[in-house]
A protein has these predicted regions:
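Short Pro/Gly-enriched beta-strand edge/turn motifs at strand-loop
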Residues: 18-25, 169-182
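ATP-binding pocket architecture of kinase catalytic cores
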Residues: 43-136
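A short, local hydrophobic-aromatic micro-motif
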Residues: 25-28, 80-83, 206
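Active-site acidic catalytic loop and adjacent metal/ATP-binding pocket
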Residues: 34-42, 49-50, 82, 174-206
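Juxta-kinase regulatory segment immediately upstream of eukaryotic protein kinase catalytic domains
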Residues: 1-26
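A cross-family kinase active-site recognition segment
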Residues: 112-164, 184-186
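ATP-binding glycine-rich phosphate-binding loop
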Residues: 19-42
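Asparagine-rich low-complexity intrinsically disordered tracts
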Residues: 10, 74-76, 146-174, 178
Length: 206
């Protein structure tokens, strides 16, 4: 379930007033996903996705993702493109939360990928890596090696039956840190690459 924030017709009117777009005639919550609230918006001619950013997403990191999607889309990567509001920003305030509207990407995900599909996905990811080498934007990796120890310490193992798991994770983290390369190459990656956000039309990757 990924419709944590409910919106109504009054909110839709507010959205319409903030963007140079046709009148929104229909909106529906999207249940897929786990982190943010998503709605499908329809106008007479087009479809869009409204994303309302929930608590787990840091407000200061959102502009990075907006700019990255915008630049990738302009580099012929078939990903959602954030719309700019009338004041020139990709972000608006909705229900006291940050929100954005992005273009709708047609197609459907596949339950199972074959080798050809995986090869095509790999080519696009490689293309993204090459494109982003030239883009001068970056962010701290919130799931990087330096963040793993605080993350592990934040876990509250409430039962003694998990004590072995706690020991296992602690020992593994020590081993990872011990063997972590000191000069590991860095760059922008697709950190959310799952089959439910890889779209196909008639078996062709978008």
């Amino acid at each position: 379930m990924a419709v944590y924030t409910k919106i109504n017709k009054k909110d839709i009117v507010s959205i319409n007033n903030q963007f140079e777009m046709e009148k929104i005639t229909h909106f529906k919550g999207i249940k897929k996903g786990i982190e943010n609230t998503n709605y499908l918006l329809k106008t007479k001619k087009n479809k869009f996705i409204l994303t309302i950013f929930e608590k787990r997403v840091s407000d200061k990191e959102i502009p990075f993702f907006m700019k990255l999607m915008y630049l990738l889309n302009n580099s012929n990567i078939n990903c959602p493109k954030p719309l700019k509001s009338k004041n020139g920003s990709h972000l608006i305030k909705l229900k006291n939360k940050k929100a954005c509207i992005v273009s709708f990407v047609n197609g459907k995900d596949k339950i199972k990928l074959n080798l050809k599909n995986c090869f095509e996905v790999g080519k696009i990811i490689a293309n993204i890596h090459e494109i982003t080498k030239k883009i001068k934007i970056s962010r701290k990796n919130s799931m990087g090696i330096k963040e793993l120890e605080p993350l592990l310490k934040s876990i509250k193992f409430r039962s003694k039956k998990f004590s072995n798991l706690q020991k296992f994770l602690t020992n593994n983290l020590k081993e990872i840190k011990k063997n972590w390369p000191s000069k590991l190459p860095q760059g922008i990656i697709h950190g959310d690459l799952f089959i439910d956000n890889i779209f196909f039309i008639k078996y062709k990757l978008l």
